[in-house]
A protein has these predicted regions:
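FAD-site-proximal beta/loop scaffold in flavoenzymes
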Residues: 138-169, 251-324
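A conserved FAD-binding loop/helix module that cradles the flavin
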Residues: 320-347
């Protein structure tokens, strides 16, 4: 997988003497790094996890994006374009603890990084998950899809032990029909679990696309569409769920209207694990008390049409500005951002 878009693999143009920091190494962060390094800028990528690649390495199943392709692209950036990767290094301004932060060996203040560079690009993505909006949502056996996938990948990479993976029961209900939910269903099915998918969308309205849901069905996954969990049943742990059919009006991934249909309640027996994949929340490298960089109501970083934030020489890109998207769109956003950063650095 190539991240060096501007020079055809020939290496960077003559150095500009400008220093750039990229915080986060998912698809948008790597697109920014590749573009700017190709233009001759000195780029350092800060990544809180032990390997670069973000969700492409620590979330998406191998069958969809082979991690070696991603790591190979990062190696090219390092060896051919001089990009420096500082992994296991969290950059923040009193930022909240995130999934995988325990693997970081170094913590650096955001302001110090901003001061030492001519431009800083925040590409920290969406690493917090939305909870299950149902009664008894705190019962044992309920997990986020992102954490489940992360622990699977971290174990495969030898970063955590097998015992630190999330242990699923025999019968799993995955909630949601976006790519994170679908990827969790793929992983759970591959592990040999009996998987059901429950979503408010019809198959043909699913954020992941009808094809992905169809693939799951061919693997034996039962899809309860236009359905939500009303109540988790059991004695302090998941044993079954009560569902209800819904009418939903959804536009651009936003639920505008959701009505439960009385009389359509159903008990799904023998559910001992619930994996929740109904959306993720932006995770900027600072908490709500940080006022230097403006955020939007939903938590993303506010940027102008050139991806510049409210703080001078600090840009933001990818899912931290748009909400969760597919890898291709995050890539494109990174390239657009890098174009404007390059223009900014040229004066």
């Amino acid at each position: 997988m190539r991240f060096s878009f501007m020079s055809g693999g020939k290496g960077p143009t003559q150095g500009t003497g400008k220093r750039v920091a990229v915080i986060g190494s998912g698809p948008s962060g790597l697109a920014v790094a590749g573009y700017l390094a190709s233009k001759g800028h000195e780029v350092t990528v800060f990544e809180r996890l032990p390997l670069p690649g973000g969700v492409m390495v620590f979330g998406i199943p191998e069958a969809r994006i082979p991690r070696e392709r991603v790591l190979g692209g990062c190696k090219e950036l390092e060896e051919v374009y001089g990009v420096k990767f500082r992994t296991s290094c969290k950059v923040s301004a009193n930022g909240d603890l995130l999934l995988g932060d325990n693997l970081a060996k170094e913590n650096i203040e955001l302001q110090g990084v901003v001061d030492e560079n001519d431009a800083t690009i925040i590409a920290t993505g969406t690493w917090n998950s939305r909870g299950l909006p149902a009664e008894n949502a705190t019962y044992k056996g309920i997990h986020s899809a992102l954490e489940y996938l992360f622990r699977c990948k971290a174990n495969e990479l030898g970063l955590i032990s097998r015992k630190e993976r999330i242990k699923l029961g025999r019968n799993v209900a995955v909630i949601g029909s976006g790519l994170v939910a679908v990827d969790a269903a793929i992983e759970a099915t591959a592990e040999g679990h009996n998987v059901r998918l429950i979503s408010i969308e019809h198959q043909f309205d699913s954020p992941s696309g009808s094809y992905e849901i169809g693939r799951l069905k061919k693997k034996g996954v039962e899809h309860f569409e236009r359905t939500v969990i009303k109540k988790v049943l059991g004695e302090g742990k998941v044993e079954s769920v009560e569902t209800i059919k819904v009418n939903a009006e959804i536009k651009a991934g936003v639920i505008l209207k959701l009505e439960q249909i009385p009389g359509t309640e159903q008990i799904i027996e023998k559910v001992d694990t619930i994996i929740v994949g109904i959306g993720q929340v932006p995770t900027p490298p600072f908490n709500k008390e940080y006022r230097d960089i403006k955020t939007l109501r939903w938590g993303g970083i506010e940027v102008n049409d050139r991806y510049l934030s409210s703080k001078g020489k600090v840009f933001a890109t990818g899912d931290i500005t748009t909400g969760i998207t597919k890898v291709g769109r995050a890539y494109q956003t990174g390239l657009k951002t890098a174009h404007w950063v390059d223009r900014y650095l040229q004066g």
